[in-house]
């Protein structure tokens, strides 16, 4: 394990270490990937927390019930593993697999202008989160937006009509009064 800061890379957050598991230095991971165990496909992780950066190597990992458990190379002590809680798990953007046409990573949607069918700017995509039914976009007001409201829009085919990354915008079927 290296605790020296990584060279400035274009890193994408794939999950977070939330606590320890067992007595051998394993950690519990909350994964943002779909399926959740895809985070285990990356052997080298960059961990970030409050300006602290660590490069680690994944020795092994498994899905245990609904919990993702990871063993990091050289991390064999439960108490030391406990200090890893709260670290974000990051990988270089260049290591992400290519997606099919019409598929997007969440990071690509963040910052897009959201425009309704009437041509009104509702705001920009701040972030997304998962629900049981579908992903949800948090759209925050920005300069030139219709009003100062924050909106929660479903990331579904019914709501999202088109995405133009080059133009930096997303067209939606959404009532501005909602």
Swiss-Prot record:
Its main location: cytoplasm. It holds the Pfam family PRC_RimM. Residues 101-178 form the PRC barrel domain. GO terms for biological process: ribosomal small subunit biogenesis; rRNA processing. The keyword Iron-sulfur does not apply. GO terms for molecular function: ribosome binding. The keyword Chaperone applies. It is found in: Cytoplasm. GO terms for cellular component: cytoplasm; ribosome. Keywords: Chaperone, Cytoplasm, Ribosome biogenesis, rRNA processing. InterPro entries: PRC_barrel-like_sf (IPR011033), PRC_RimM (IPR056792), RimM (IPR011961), RimM_N (IPR002676), RimM_N_sf (IPR036976), Transl_B-barrel_sf (IPR009000). An accessory protein needed during the final step in the assembly of 30S ribosomal subunit, possibly for assembly of the head region. Essential for efficient processing of 16S rRNA. May be needed both before and after RbfA during the maturation of 16S rRNA. It has affinity for free ribosomal 30S subunits but not for 70S ribosomes. Binds ribosomal protein uS19. Belongs to the RimM family. The PRC barrel domain binds ribosomal protein uS19. This is Ribosome maturation factor RimM.
